[in-house]
From Swiss-Prot:
One GO CC term, this protein: cytoplasm
Organism, as annotated: Haemophilus influenzae (strain ATCC 51907 / DSM 11121 / KW20 / Rd)
Membrane-spanning ranges: none
Highest taxon in the source lineage: Bacteria
Protein name stated in the entry: Ribosome-binding ATPase YchF
Origin organism lineage: Bacteria, Pseudomonadati, Pseudomonadota, Gammaproteobacteria, Pasteurellales
A Pfam family assignment: MMR_HSR1
Annotated positions binding Mg(2+): S16, T36
């Protein structure tokens, strides 16, 4: 289980450059709109130094990180919800993703044209958010018409669903985001099947120049917008990231040291996406493989077992658990057992990030 994050943005904001760096896919990042029409998909390993630390102790035959999927969706333009600039296709592609990474241009460069002729992150964000809201408004209005008929017939579920739709309708009419409405669990469940675009967790990826991480008024503007929406901002320099992506591991370390950076910005993008979707990692560690697995925060041990195989959940008996810190501190399973840090947990155990687990099951 990974997740699918759609990378969106206006044409020429650095979206494909960023995606290429993420996946080393080498898509045509040409300096004109719509050079990405079919979405390009890349599966990216989740950067997690804990895997290497576990492998140092266990000495497995192989190491397998958990992954996530990024989808490069063509540059959206004003009017996309009415089909402008191949808009319908783009919006349908976004609908299939779990989260949105919205790339916003926060740099000046006369060689790279901006579709609106000027750099204004607020305008750029408004343009895309308006298109997403208009697409949702269309879905919402059609749903209301259908639900009214069922509600009149006394359908309780339809009545509740209708009340939620009527709650979000005025927000969408004002080009607002459904995610800022503060719907409760029951309300969210009622409209889940509609896959609303403005309900998807969103991070703003601010594409800056090499020296644009500080004292950058464009970046400050994006942070202000995100704070109002409850969204995350991850500043990166796509140009630097594409250079880093071409280097081997040794050169990468040197290059980052020269720039005074601890890790590639893309690692922050991937981790922010992970957090956005409320995901966490647990590990299995044996001589055959040390492997990372993705589960939702709050998942029980049987649900975590199901990620490996559904049989593990069906026949779940117990989970053997060692906290990651204990596994490292006591140099593996035997040391953790001697220190009393190895434990057996039942089906109600809530998995913690970094747990090293082994499942006992019977099918």
């Amino acid at each position: 289980m990974g997740f699918k994050c759609g990378i969106v943005g206006l044409p020429n904001v650095g979206k494909s450059t960023l995606f290429n760096a993420l996946t080393k896919a080498g898509i045509e990042a040409a300096n004109y709109p719509f050079c990405t029409i079919e979405p390009n998909t890349g599966v990216v390993p989740m950067p997690d130094p804990r895997l290497d630390a576990l492998a140092e102790i266990v000495k497995p035959e192989r190491i397998l990180p958990t992954t996530m999927e990024f989808v490069d969706i063509a540059g959206l333009v004003a009017g996309a919800s009415k089909g402008e600039g191949l808009g319908n296709k783009f919006l349908a592609n976004i609908r299939e993703t779990d989260a949105i990474g919205h790339v916003v241009r926060c740099f000046e460069n006369d060689d790279i044209v901006h579709v609106a002729g000027k750099i204004d992150p607020l305008d750029d964000i408004d343009t895309i958010n308006t298109e997403l809201a208009l697409a949702d408004l269309d879905s919402c209005e059609r749903a209301i018409q259908r639900l009214q008929k069922r509600a009149k017939g006394g359908d309780k579920e339809a009545k509740f669903e209708l009340s939620v739709m009527e709650k979000i309708l005025p927000v969408l009419e004002n080009a607002g985001m459904i995610r800022s409405v503060g719907l409760d669990k029951e309300e969210l469940q009622a409209i889940k099947s509609y896959n609303f675009l403005t309900l998807k967790p969103t991070m703003y990826i601010a594409n800056v120049n090499e020296d644009g991480f500080e004292n950058n008024p464009y970046l400050d503007r994006v942070r202000e917008i995100a704070a109002k929406e409850g969204a995350v901002v991850v500043p990166v320099c796509a140009a630097i990231e594409s250079e880093i992506a071409e280097l081997d591991d040794e050169e990468k370390v040197e290059f980052l040291q020269d720039l005074g950076i601890e890790e590639p910005g893309l690692n922050r993008v991937i981790r922010a996406g992970y957090a956005l979707l409320n995901l966490q990692t647990y590990f299995t560690a044996g001589v055959k493989e040390v492997r990372a697995w993705t589960v939702s925060v709050g998942a029980t041990a049987p649900k975590a077992a199901a990620v490996i195989h559904t049989d593990f959940e069906k026949g779940f008996i117990r989970a053997e658990v060692i906290a990651y810190e204990d596994f490292i501190q006591f140099n593996g399973e035997n040391g953790a057992k001697e220190a009393g840090k190895w434990r057996l947990e039942g089906k109600d155990y809530i998995v913690q990030d970094g747990d090293v687990m082994h499942f006992r099951f019977n099918v």
